[in-house]
Amino acid sequence: MVQMIGRMGGTLGAPFECFRGVYDIDWFQQDISHPVPNDDVDLQLVWLRAIELEGAKIDSHVLAEYWNTYICATLSEYGTGKNNFNMGIEPPLCGRMRNPNKDSNGAWIRSEIWACACAGNPQLAATYAYFDSSVDHADEGVYAAVFCAVIESAAFFEKDIRKLIEIGKSYIPEDCKIVC
């Protein structure tokens, strides 16, 4: 239920993404008679397609190629990563170079796909979350994605929240801001 409400909020809030302010809204701002693009959900669907077609061959380069082929998002870190890749800058550098949003939240909010694809295998979830996040993020943006993918993957079998947090922390640098 919470996830569904979050997705609805993401869809209905999309016209205001990247804009700060208080809005006086009394109706939907877009046509909702059919599904509207949502870059975060769209990326997860593209990753599922990559898993289906590429299997274990998935790495950052493969994901960047799929991103470039299927995703139109040009905002923020998404656009920077894509533009860098189009200029021949390979992951993980395409997520780092000229990217003022490299530490942003775009990668961790889509990391659940790797947790579900690698249910109960946090190490594999961490690997794929790294491959994914390094296309458009670096540093804290990557650590957050890995941390979330790991704890969500482990949560399929571990229910103790404190243990899950410790498991997640074991996959990222001790001195990163996610841990501190």
Region annotations inferred by a language model:
Residues 1-180:
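Structured, active/binding-site neighborhoods that engage oxygen-rich ligands
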